[in-house]
Amino acid sequence: ARFEAAIENAMALSNRINTWEGRWPLDTYARDMDAAALSQYARERLADARSMSQEIYQGLLTERAAIRDLYAALQEKFDACMTLAAPGAAPQGLAWTGDPAFTVATSLIGMPAVTLPVLKDQGLPLGLQVIGFVDQDATLFAHADALQSIFNP
């Protein structure tokens, strides 16, 4: 329950970290190339990044490290964890590819993951995400293979 509570704001935390880390490429482009060519979103993100300090960024990394530690502790009880890859089927069209909340949380903690196309929602594929632990990629793939065999005998 502690880990689940800790990742409730994974999207916001990941976005803030990415905003800081994306500052320099955007800054370089805006300064040396064509700032007007940046999208409104990129300009807003750059302004947000410029308003952040190294101390804020360090605090974000500390928060991420604490979440990673909570996840690592799960290895004492579990060989892998599972979640959906998304909250539902991908929407139709190309305007939006769907909610990445579940995959963002996995990326935030930096763990290896495999998505198995074994479920359906509204007749469309819905992935089952199997998440492993640091340096346990072979174990993760073994569990993913076993699950794939169960869903598709």
Predicted regions located by residue number:
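Short glycine/threonine-rich loop-to-helix capping motif typified by GTGT followed
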Residues: 10-19, 92-97
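Small-aliphatic-rich amphipathic alpha-helix that forms the alpha element of a beta-alpha
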Residues: 70, 96-117
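Short helix-loop capping/hinge segments that flank enzyme active sites or metal/cofactor-binding pockets
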Residues: 13-68, 117-127
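Gly/Ser-rich, acidic/histidine-flanked active-site/gating loops
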Residues: 1-13, 119
